[in-house]
A protein has these predicted regions:
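Short membrane-interface loop/juxtamembrane segments of multi-pass integral membrane proteins
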Residues: 28-29, 35, 113-134
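Alpha-helical transmembrane segments and their immediate juxtamembrane boundary regions
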Residues: 27-30, 34-107, 135-158
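Short, compositionally biased low-complexity segments
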Residues: 2-11, 95-103
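Serine/threonine-rich low-complexity intrinsically disordered regions
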Residues: 2, 19, 44, 73-74, ...
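Short, charged cytosolic
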Residues: 3-28, 110-118
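Phosphate-binding glycine-rich loops and adjacent basic patches that engage nucleotide phosphates
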Residues: 1-3, 16-18, 85-93
């Protein structure tokens, strides 16, 4: 079923042809899609944050001429090296968890037109999965960001 056909079916159920059960299904559909919209928005902001952290960390970790620990004691140099690399990996893995959250969901409707409990269950499963992915992306981004802040502090204080 095309997106246009889906929209027409939902509009008919909500406006004219729908029973109270149909209208409840449409309301559930709308609520679940609103949740996906919020996840998309939050994930977009998280990916922007990760882009900044990854770019900064990649510059500090990969570009040898910008080594802020060149004149540091071996312990500080090793600690900075480890924190920088771990933070970079955490931020990149965070992006890996975030990208599926903003993907397009296919196959919610089966061949039969209409909205039923199975369609709502499939959409609910998509929301649940993407919420789980976003939660992990957020945790990893926070860990990567904290690592970046620690790296900056080490480079500044040493």
């Amino acid at each position: 079923m095309s997106a246009g056909q889906q929209a027409v079916v939902l509009a008919r159920l909500q406006a004219v042809d729908g029973t109270p059960q149909d209208k409840a299904l449409v309301a559930a559909w709308d609520r679940l899609f609103a949740m996906l919209n919020v996840l998309d928005s939050k994930t977009s902001a998280l990916l922007r944050f990760n882009a900044i952290v990854v770019a900064a960390l990649a510059y500090l970790v990969v570009v040898a001429g910008a080594d802020p620990f060149a004149q540091s004691k071996p312990l500080i140099k090793t600690l900075g090296f480890a924190v920088g690399h771990v933070s970079l990996v955490l931020s990149v893995v965070s992006c890996g968890f975030a990208f599926p959250v903003i993907g397009v969901a296919h196959g919610l409707f089966d061949a039969a037109p209409g909205l039923d409990d199975a369609v709502i269950a499939r959409l609910g499963a998509v929301v649940t999965r993407r919420t789980w992915l976003y939660a992990w992306a957020w945790r990893l981004a926070v860990a990567g960001g904290v690592g970046f802040a620690l790296l900056v502090a080490l480079a500044t204080i040493h």
